[in-house]
Swiss-Prot record:
InterPro entries listed in its UniProt record: Beta-lactam/transpept-like, Glyco_trans_51, Glycosyltr_51/Transpeptidase, Lysozyme-like_dom_sf, PBP_transglycosylase
Similarity comment: In the N-terminal section; belongs to the glycosyltransferase 51 family. In the C-terminal section; belongs to the transpeptidase family.
GO-annotated molecular function: peptidoglycan glycosyltransferase activity; serine-type D-Ala-D-Ala carboxypeptidase activity
Key word Translocase present: no
Name of the encoding gene: pbpA
Region (Transpeptidase): 378-663
Ranges per topology, Cytoplasmic: 1-30
Protein's organism: Clostridium perfringens (strain ATCC 13124 / DSM 756 / JCM 1290 / NCIMB 6125 / NCTC 8237 / Type A)
Protein name in the entry: Penicillin-binding protein 1A
Length: 830
């Protein structure tokens, strides 16, 4: 035992020796130095990180933050006040003196009790929240408290986003400290109360007072102030109008009592006020008088699309997020100068509202729904296509609630035959496939054409017959579907869609066939809408008066920020070349025929030239007219939101309305024409073959078949007409009764006709030269295939099995009605 004690003592002495103590001391010394260095390094790294975040913070624009108290304003094209910006986000700016003292104290008490003491951030609250959150984590609670002051919340609402990150929090704290250096406490609190989210679409205490109590904010009592003060922490949870809280109001009632308790604790209200308020809640609860009515602007149809366009342009130019641009538009003090002509806008609305304009529609056109809104609706757009500025845009007929669906701008529908100038004849002429005088056969599709177009069975014309050889001009005037399908097939679906998309039409995945490009039949799936609207069509038809150039349509001319700086400007229009100047002019000239002598005569007004095209969708469910003058382009739509048949024709209803509104737009304007470009010529053509005429084309028993029409230089036909042929027949001897079979040696001799020498100044069009020259509907026994001859011109068949002869001149067969009519898609459009 003694030996063991001695060994233990020796080890203890060795351990406590100065040498060993020195090692321990050194270890502890270096350990603490290491900890210190690690701490210094960590602090340095964190400091550098924080400093880098601060440096990346957005510049504090105090005026911009205060401008959240300024409503954005819209002006008309003369600079006169139109509307205050009202978005779906309801926000009504009020001054500090309009806000009750109890409401200010309620927010301060429950949100930031040391608001009047701190300099932007509450250090005491930060450490208190950290300790509370750590304690909660240790106890298994997932509840996390926040430490943001009112100043920080204002910075988040006005400058930053709702992103949850340390970076955003550091920026928020830094900017809050900076803001306190520039604004008084009352200025900060007032701006905060005008911008704080209050649930749903309500922002600011004034909007909330209207929603919950139908009161001006200045008229709120103590309990109502306490309720709104408690609402902002969790607007959905404490929403007294929600169904859940109506059944069990204890959540928002207890929250209101908590606000009152805090106000009393801080000395903002007396004990008597506190007790009276609590007794009122216990006895009567909180009496809500909800007001969910959305505010309506003075020029609802024009204002909201203009705001939409400005938002999109701001996001594109300045890379704003949706949240940022919504804040800026709602209350950023912007001045938006629109292109709206106030008088024209009002007058177009009156025309669309007038029940007398819909008398041709026989199935109760003035019927209203349960909200007092006409079931039969209409929309219209008028554009100065040179500048792209929209002068009038009306999205509905009759009085309608705020935020009603704008059919002129937001809606997309099938456009029927209004597509034909845009995606059929315009592209065909532009691509050099023909001119106004090129001929296409209005006849049933051949088997080859059925296959190439995708039709299983024969499509039909609206007029339910076939007209035989038609010029492009006549085909578009009478809106031949068969002719359009054949020409569109030559153009190619992909080419047609490319033109249509550049013109603003939208093609969904199921609307990429020839029935869409030739006839305007869009699928228009509710989940994937496509087609066009009057805004789109008015812009598109403007190209025919603007040398083939589409000027981007704009509803505003410029936007100024709250400091008066121009932040958006449309004085230099965005332009896209669609057609050549020559092709666009030829289409314009063709489109005048439907107004001058076709189904759209009522679209004509005064002495101003008018060109346009009707459109009808399947089953007479939509009627359209789109057109232009040398000054403006416009489009009209009439139909039901829930489509149903209208039992008349597009030209009967839409063209008179077009004439009326465009007459108003052209008041006091002088006659002028669209300027004819160089590079086009009027060329003599045979209206039966579409080829160069010979002298025989003038000898047709129906009258001369030669006429003159526009072609782009170099695209006119080069082949001579082979329809009209001069035959010499050896007639039998009528005195010989026995020679009925004896003249086998008699031969028909064909002589080559002379080329016709046309007068190149002749301006006759087919309908002007001989109104009786239109082919009849006599069935033909010949091949109805369409051939492409001479520079891509679509021409009718050339090899016939049966010829009608008269005076030795062979005339072409007429279109037949004897084809299979069991078509895959026999919907009729015009």
């Amino acid at each position: 035992m003694t030996e063991r004690k001695r060994e233990h003592k020796d080890r203890k002495q060795k351990k406590n020796s100065p040498k060993n103590q020195s090692k321990v001391t050194k270890f502890l010394k270096w350990f603490f130095i290491g900890i210190l260095l690690l701490g210094i390094t960590a602090v340095t790294v964190v400091g550098i990180y924080v400093l880098s975040i601060i440096r990346s913070s957005p510049e504090l624009d105090v005026q911009a933050i205060q401008s959240l108290n300024q409503p954005s304003i819209l002006y008309d094209d003369q600079g006169n006040f139109m509307d205050n910006v009202i978005t779906r986000e309801q926000r009504y700016v009020v001054k500090s003196e309009e806000i009750p003292d109890n409401l200010k104290k309620a927010f301060v008490a429950i949100e930031d009790e040391r608001f009047y003491e701190h300099k932007g951030i509450d250090i005491k609250r930060i450490f208190g929240v950290i300790a509370s959150n750590i304690k909660g984590k240790l106890s298994g609670s997932n509840t996390v408290q926040g430490a943001s002051t009112i100043t920080q919340q204002l910075i988040k609402n006005a400058v930053l986003t709702n992103e949850v990150s340390y970076e955003r929090k550091i920026k928020e704290m830094y900017l809050a400290l900076e803001l306190e250096k520039h604004l008084s406490k009352d200025e900060i609190l007032t701006t905060y109360l005008n911008t704080i989210p209050m649930g749903g679409y309500q922002y600011g205490v004034s909007a909330a007072a209207q929603r919950f109590f139908s009161k001006n904010v200045s008229d709120l009592n103590l309990v109502e102030c306490a309720y709104l003060g408690g609402l902002t922490q969790a607007p959905t949870s404490y929403d007294g109008l929600s169904e859940a809280n109506k059944e069990n109001p204890s959540r928002y009632l207890n929250r209101t009592k908590s606000v009152l308790f805090k106000m009393h604790e801080l000395g903002y209200i007396s004990s008597e006020q506190y007790n009276d308020a609590i007794n009122e809640i216990d006895t009567n609860g909180i009496k809500f008088t909800p007001n969910n009515k959305l505010s309506k602007t003075n020029f609802e149809w024009f204002t909201r699309p203009a705001i939409t366009q400005v938002k999109q342009d701001l996001m594109n130019k300045y890379k704003y997020t949706q949240e940022e641009v919504d804040k800026l538009i709602a209350n950023g003090g912007l001045k938006i100068y629109t292109s709206m002509d106030r008088n024209l806008q009002n007058n177009v609305q009156k025309v669309l509202d007038d029940p007398n304009n819909y008398k041709a529609i026989t199935n109760n056109p003035n019927e209203k729904n349960e909200d007092g809104v006409y079931k039969l609706q209409a929309s219209a757009t008028i554009i100065d296509y040179k500048t792209g500025h929209v002068k009038a845009l009306v999205g509905g007929r009759g009085e309608q609630p705020a935020m009603s669906h704008n059919r002129a701008y937001y809606d997309l529908k099938s456009i029927g035959s209004a597509t034909k100038p845009l995606t059929v004849y315009g592209p065909a002429i532009d691509l050099g496939l023909g001119g106004a005088g090129s001929v296409v056969n209005d006849s049933p599709l051949s088997n080859k054409e059925l296959s190439s177009t995708g039709y299983k069975d024969q499509p039909k014309n609206e007029y339910n017959s076939y007209r035989g050889p038609l010029t492009f001009r006549e085909a578009i005037k009478i809106s031949s579907n068969l002719a359009a399908i054949k020409v569109a097939n030559e153009v190619g679906v992909s080419n047609s869609i490319a033109y249509g998309e550049k013109l603003g039409l939208v093609y969904g995945p199921h609307s990429r066939g020839i029935s869409t490009t030739a006839l305007g039949q869009f699928q228009n799936d509710p989940n994937n809408p496509d087609g066009g609207n009057t805004y789109t069509l008015a812009s598109a038809f403007g190209v025919f008066g603007n040398n083939g150039v589409k000027t981007n349509a704009k509803l505003y001319t410029k936007v100024l920020d709250s400091h008066g700086n121009v932040i958006l400007d449309t004085s230099t229009p965005e332009e896209t070349k669609i057609f050549s100047p020559q092709a666009s002019y030829i289409v314009y000239d063709m489109l005048k025929d439907q107004v001058e002598s076709g189904s759209a005569k009522p679209a004509k007004f005064g002495n101003i030239p008018v060109a346009g095209k009707t459109g009808t969708t399947t089953g007479d469910k939509d009627y359209l007219f789109a057109g232009l003058t040398p000054y403006y382009s416009a489009a009209i739509w009439i139909g039901y939101d829930k489509p149903r048949e209208m039992r008349t024709s597009s030209g009967t209803v839409t063209s008179p309305i077009f004439g009326k509104i465009m007459g108003l737009a052209h008041k006091d304007l002088q006659y002028k024409e669209v300027e004819q470009p160089s590079g086009i010529s009027k060329i003599a053509v045979c209206m039966d073959s579409g080829l160069k005429p010979t002298s025989l084309c003038t000898q047709d028993p129906r009258g001369s078949r030669v006429y003159y029409d526009w072609f782009i230089n170099g695209s006119a036909p080069t082949q001579y007409c082979n329809y009209h042929t001069n035959l010499h027949v050896n007639a039998p001897d009528t005195n010989d009764n026995n020679n009925s079979g004896a003249n086998e040696g008699n031969k028909q001799q064909e002589t080559k006709p002379e080329e016709v020498k046309p007068n190149e100044n002749n301006n006759n069009k087919p309908n002007e030269q001989n109104p009786n020259n239109k082919p009849d509907n006599t069935p033909a026994n010949g091949n109805n295939n369409t051939n492409n001859n001479g520079g891509g011109n679509v021409t009718p068949p050339q090899n016939q099995t049966e010829n009608n002869t008269n005076n030795g001149v062979i005339t072409p067969p007429q279109a037949g009605n004897n084809q299979n009519q069991n078509g895959q898609n026999n919907n009729i459009t015009q």
